[in-house]
A protein has these predicted regions:
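Short catalytic helix/loop segments, enriched in acidic residues and glycine
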Residues: 45-53, 209-222
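Structural motif
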Residues: 236-245
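Alpha-helical cap/lid subdomain in secreted, periplasmic
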Residues: 111, 244-408, 416, 420-421, ...
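Compositionally biased, intrinsically disordered or flexible polar/acidic segments
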Residues: 19-206, 369
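A short beta-strand-loop structural module common to alpha/beta enzyme folds
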Residues: 223-237
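Bacterial Sec-dependent N-terminal signal peptides
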Residues: 1-20
Length: 440
């Protein structure tokens, strides 16, 4: 009888948890704040209960006494990942970081290394409360009644991505990450910026690859704006349609939301006609976004790292950037000319130093990498961060309505004077792969 009661209790608690959209977790020991779920160093993720750490090795519970919520915490000497089974949507996440008897240093990312909090340092005895806003997605396309009407055709490699696994995963990283609580609440009012594009935009899961899309959330005020990155490596405008990625967005986007569109690298290689294919689809997307009350923003594709004998960037994208500029004028929509800004940025870096922004690494720098990595299209985390700042700069300089949502994390930026790479902060995640993303 006792076993049956225990089973029934576990089943009911699991069922109720699965229906929840608000969650309160007290990290540390079994000494727990009222109304919070205790999370200790042994709380390994369990599908039955719907939450826990991806890996508990190296985790340490510390209890300093005092306040039940902030007097204890979880820490580790390596990155650790906390996952929660949660319905797709926009969420605010409130996190308490610090140590009532010591100092801490924490960087927070979500899903596929999407940057949220960078190098948050607390002094001895200091506890800080930080908020981030996150978009959680799945591959199912639903109508307004929530009924399934389709599905995104994911590529095989996408099945391993953290942003398609029906979980919200939070990465805690840095020298001394110390987490005492995590509260997750729905955010139904935030503007959503939907991003479409290819491997130069995607939330890349594996070090050393990165894109501006996954750095973008760091520069926005939480609660007001949420970034929803639907880009994927190797995609063209046509492929984005064929795999129903854009259909997913059309069924989710709301009036006042934004649709960022950056394609060109793969459209060029696919032999798509600028006139009958590329421009036609751009116009159709712009028209559909406007029809739904959303705000389209065109982003020209950044340059590849190809220099001429005078150390000037060579245009390898044919007429695709110009075609997008023309469409922006014809359709009277916002344009972020990342193509022009990247030319300035890369020329300021120069042929040799610009390698530090791309995936250029000696053999054996990463697992299963017997040969050198030398990629003139795809960026590392530093390059992706610099390009994200270019996009934000354009928003600010053009006085786009989104300007009022830019956070204090963005100070100012001049592509003629790139940030010093030695001052760029990025503790690497545990996910690493030398395989080049789709597309070029």
């Amino acid at each position: 009888m006792q076993n049956w009661i225990k089973f029934l209790t576990l089943f009911l608690s699991s069922f109720l948890f699965a229906q929840q959209t608000t969650f309160k977790f007290d990290f540390g020991t079994d000494r727990t704040e009222n109304g919070f779920i205790p999370i200790t160093s042994t709380s390994k993720f369990d599908k039955k209960i719907g939450y826990g750490f991806m890996d508990i090795s190296g985790l340490k519970s510390v209890d300093n006494g005092g306040n039940a919520l902030t007097g204890d915490f979880i820490t580790s000497d390596k990155p650790f990942y906390f996952s929660v089974a949660i319905p797709e949507g926009n969420y605010n996440i409130t996190i308490n970081l610090g140590d009532s008897k010591g100092a801490s240093e924490t960087t927070v990312r979500v899903e596929n290394r999407r940057l949220m909090l960078n190098d948050i340092k607390t002094k001895q005895g200091e506890i800080v409360e930080k908020q981030i806003s996150v978009h959680v997605k799945d591959s199912i396309i639903r109508n307004q009644n929530g009924e399934k009407i389709g599905i995104i055709k994911l590529k095989p490699r996408e099945t391993k991505y953290l942003h398609w696994d029906n979980l919200l995963t939070i990465e805690f990283n840095d020298k001394t990450p110390k987490v005492s609580s995590v509260v997750i609440q729905p955010n139904p009012t935030a503007k959503t910026i939907y991003i479409t594009g290819d491997s130069t935009v995607v939330d890349a899961q594996y070090e050393p690859w990165a894109s501006w899309g996954q750095m973008f959330p760091y520069f926005f005020v939480p609660n007001e704006v949420v970034i929803a990155n639907y880009a994927e490596s190797g995609e063209t405008l046509k492929a984005f349609e064929d795999r129903h990625r854009i259909d997913k967005i059309w069924n989710k986007i709301n009036p006042g939301d934004y649709l960022f569109i950056q394609f060109g690298h793969n459209d060029q290689k696919a032999g798509n006609s600028i006139k009958s294919g590329y421009k036609k689809r751009l116009k159709e997307w712009i028209g559909k976004a406007k029809q739904l009350g959303a705000i389209p923003v065109l982003v020209t594709s950044m340059n590849r790292r190809v220099f001429d004998e005078s150390n000037k960037i060579v245009n390898t994208l044919d007429d695709f950037p110009d075609a997008m500029r023309e469409i922006a004028k014809e359709e009277n929509v916002y344009l972020i000319d990342l193509n022009a800004m990247s030319e300035t940025l890369f020329e300021a870096m120069g042929p040799e130093n610009s390698k530090k922004a791309f995936v250029y690494y000696p053999a054996n720098s990463y697992p299963n990498q017997p040969t050198v990595l030398a990629d003139d299209t795809h960026f590392n985390t530093y390059g992706a961060y610099e390009l994200a700042k270019c996009v934000v700069k354009s928003i600010v300089d053009q006085n786009l309505p989104l300007k009022k949502y830019i956070s204090k994390n963005y100070k100012t930026f001049n592509p003629n004077k790139p940030d010093d790479i030695d001052r760029f902060h990025w503790p690497e995640s545990i996910f690493m792969e030398s395989l080049k993303p789709d597309g070029n």
